[in-house]
Amino acid sequence: SKDSLLHRYIRTQLVDGLLYEAVIENTPEEYVLCEHNEALFNLFGYSFSVVGDLPLGYPEYDEEYFEEWKEFAEKVNSFYCDNINEQWAEHVFYILYTNKDFLFRFNTEVAKVVKDLKKADYPNMLKRDGVIKRRNFPVWLQKAVKMRDRNRCQLCGKDLSGTYNLSDENFDHMVPLEDGGTNDPCNIQLTCEHCNKSKGARSRDYKNIIIPFW
């Protein structure tokens, strides 16, 4: 799925989580006017005016104003979730997807969960307890991985663009399926055929190869 585990993690833990904390730790007025919310609205070209005029008065002194601010805060929250949440998640994903060190740590944590899964509960997904079935990688994912990894083997650095050699490209799991890995887009890396076949079934070899722009 193009909606990767990392996308979901960003939305639920980094985006919705921050929003939830802001709501429960502040009054409606403080929540609406907090720098965090205003900065996010401005980042994506919005202002609070898109949901209406700011209420007047001070909610801590008047229950009527408190209800007005609460209603306005709910509108801000709703607009945020419908229009900003997904955009922000994509921005964060764009940065994290290029960081192999982060992806390795992320997939290592995911593997801890996968290892506890039982085939009896997920017969269509698991090969056996704690091991996900292998899946073919769609063309869109292969293109994305090649673009991110700059057409180079992520273990030896060999060029796999076909310009300088004819080495066969392979798409490899950073955290192997046999060790709790998944077929998720964020767990796939580009390798040459030699390096891929040289790895053991449980090998977690990877390198965070950084190719400078100049």
Residue ranges: model-predicted function:
Residues 158-190, 205, 210-211:
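Histidine-centered nuclease catalytic patch
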Residues 161, 197-200:
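Short functional micro-motifs and their immediate structural scaffolds
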Residues 110-158:
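Short, charged surface segments at domain edges that flank catalytic/cofactor-binding sites
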